[in-house]
């Protein structure tokens, strides 16, 4: 049973109402004492607006600023391993769960602490291990393997309890809109069974334990048997389930909501397809191919302007998918093509076989495309730099990949008088010359040939076959400079253009006369922040016009005290 112990019940509401007081940012706030020397990273995450990083260690935790510039702003050292730590924006409010390896600590105990006052606001004890904690300005979400607890964050009052199917990886997502009138949604995996209009409440959601007992109709778009990749959308304001979005046939590996709650991105445990849905309608808006080979997707995140989706995976590659007009038109074209009937022809024996081939995809339309149409090239361990700079980037027209104004001015400073071919090259996706390899060049050539074949043969092939040859792929990518193997990572994107100095050699071919030049170029780039389980923070730059390979701008250690 749930047990709550308040350490400061009288002043709880007053303390939480003052959570807007920011934590110290001068680097001097820290508490020292006897502690373990092992600074192993147990947990690492960004806060809601990606302005801070929270790191759970074997000897306490650390808080870092990453905007406008990187720096440590708070540290607690103690003889307790921290398994989960979550921030509430840049405030002094933290939610902490211990690993439970030391006497007196427990992974079932959640502490709400105020770092500014160095006090514990309250403790919450749960019936099983806490797998995930999420915070918004109005709600505290605690996820166990088979329950989700919803609290009012200003009073710590339990509002609702949801019984779920086993969720051992702690998969859930929240919209984090600062505006209280915005879409306040929770997304979590649906039970692995057929969900119908009449049975959704009974099989998927138990409303006992909350202040609102929900017995209402749910708009469900799931109609396929034996699905385990559906997502339940839950309204945290009304405390009622909204809909079930049919995302994948196989089990979910990652889900995320846009900050305003309008979009949902999902990936299955196959790791080859990333999909984006409208939360309001449940309609699939985009489908992207991350790779051919199955891999583990660690995280998905939207940019704050909803123009990009960022995905990290066990391949140590980060993919950036653009939610632009050209991508939307391409997805729409494929849907239209799939629904367009083929012209009837005189029947022959050979055409009967072809007819069966055409009918089969329509009969299996409920099948997850992950099984059939997943493509890409995520063989990072076998081929270095694999899937990030395939010619599939040509799916987005070169006209849309014009250099930004700042980039154009930078190139003009040393490329004046170049011919038309070199000028056209400036509109191509950026390519990191350090990642070029023979295998990568062969891969790009083969994908170009496949794409040309798809364009010529697309009208004669069933839509599912042609979509394999002509996929919608990532707009940009980057390779993490990991030291070891099996490195986990999460990434977020800052949608504010910033002027950065980049070595000229990054943009030049190795056989170019300018490749060895030490001249720095000024480019307008979007920043992508990446943190890894090794305890490193990376800042990469993305050219929003050209895409392609992202440029490593900064690298910091979150463990090294000399940082």
UniProtKB/Swiss-Prot annotation:
It is a peripheral membrane protein. It is found in: Preautophagosomal structure membrane; Vacuole membrane; Endosome membrane. One of its GO terms (biological process) is positive regulation of vacuole organization. The keyword Plastid does not apply. The keyword Repeat applies. Pfam families: PROPPIN. It comes from the Eukaryota. SMART domains: WD40. Keywords: Autophagy, Endosome, Membrane, Protein transport, Repeat, Transport, Vacuole, WD repeat. GO terms for cellular component: cytosol; endosome membrane; fungal-type vacuole membrane; PAS complex; phagophore; phagophore assembly site membrane. Belongs to the WD repeat PROPPIN family. Component of the PI(3,5)P2 regulatory complex. The N-terminus might form a beta-propeller domain involved in specific binding to phosphatidylinositol 3,5-bisphosphate (PIP2), leading to the association of the protein to the membrane. The PI(3,5)P2 regulatory complex regulates both the synthesis and turnover of phosphatidylinositol 3,5-bisphosphate (PtdIns(3,5)P2). Necessary for proper vacuole morphology. Plays an important role in osmotically-induced vacuole fragmentation. Required for cytoplasm to vacuole transport (Cvt) vesicle formation, pexophagy and starvation-induced autophagy. Involved in correct ATG9 trafficking to the pre-autophagosomal structure. Might also be involved in premeiotic DNA replication. This is Autophagy-related protein 18. It comes from Scheffersomyces stipitis (strain ATCC 58785 / CBS 6054 / NBRC 10063 / NRRL Y-11545) (Yeast).
